[in-house]
Amino acid sequence: ESLLSAFDLTAREAEVLYWVVQGKINLDIADILGASPATVKKHLERIHGKLGVETRTAAAAMAVNRVRALQRSG
């Protein structure tokens, strides 16, 4: 939930980002969410835009850092 508000993500984008942080590849994420790999790729493109990053690794790192900061502050 904190990722939703911290980065203005949709619920589905937050789910995709969660699985990226867990180290899953697009095909795995698609299977988990019952979506196509192309849909997962599109969600990742939107996530990258909202976070201002270019790679899934950068997106994952930013998400982990934000969650840690939120846990420390509250």
Regions found by a protein language model. Give the residues of each.
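Helix-turn-helix DNA-binding segment
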Residues: E1-K42, K50, V64-G74
